[in-house]
């Protein structure tokens, strides 16, 4: 859930620095499991000071089927109740910083990390990520960790400095379609690999690739995304600064 709190005490907050989950004495560790806050099902809390006395949060989770409008509506109602409990917990366990604070806003829409993905000519998998796999049709690099937010998710070691994998153009080209390409979080991956490739840097990489590819295709006499000249595409991407 995304929320903004205002009237946070600037001085007192400067003394604690943050309320991130990684802070061992942070308030979320007291809020989670407390019967007063039953909607808080995990310890996810990420905060960012965005203005004087204004703190933005990415905190908590709500399970939802994003293909079902009823489920989405229920999740948005439950999510705002969850936000209220997080606010009250922060007031209780960090009163010096948050005692006079108030909820200024919540996100207008439900944020969905994983929903529909499109089946392309190639599906990038967890095994590819673990192997730091290279591809002949690679159009960029990625080194982000496997960031899956379900509580029972397996945790995989992050890449070391300098390690990365290739992103194949073939996971951007939907099978059976000639005039549609995909970029960002809807590219063809399995669930765990999606946890790495859904974020902004690889989305920028795949977006740049399909943009350049589209420019090439539109000049063709018989446009077809599956007939892109990969070497020409890679050459142009290198020229504009993309790491291949």
Segments (PLM) and residue ranges:
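Flavin (FAD/FMN)-binding glycine-rich loop and adjacent Rossmann-like elements that form
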Residues: 1-244
